[in-house]
């Protein structure tokens, strides 16, 4: 499924709700898209729990620019998917995920250069990669195949 992941930008988090659960966040100004930044855009397999697990391991996709997926992060499911997850935005809560209204167009974009990621058997996706050797290597490392 195609997803975007958004994390609070500490410099823009005026209500200091980074890593706080949904109820606390609501009591302190709500989930404000303008305080978030996109840290991943791409395709992953599985459901929301699988996404949480994937982005808490060293094997997360090479274009991921965030910290381990945590409470207060937002996962946006884009379009239809084989898992039957309703497209929309999901707040990562203390336990599970809460469907929320979230205008991702108000979030800051990812850092780096724009890149078209083409993977076998998947729809191409535009993403961003930081302009340093390590980030560029990680972005393509999972997608290179030997040809003889």
List the predicted regions and their residue ranges.
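Short, conserved turn/kink motifs that form compact alpha/beta structural patches or helix kinks used as
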Residues: 33-82
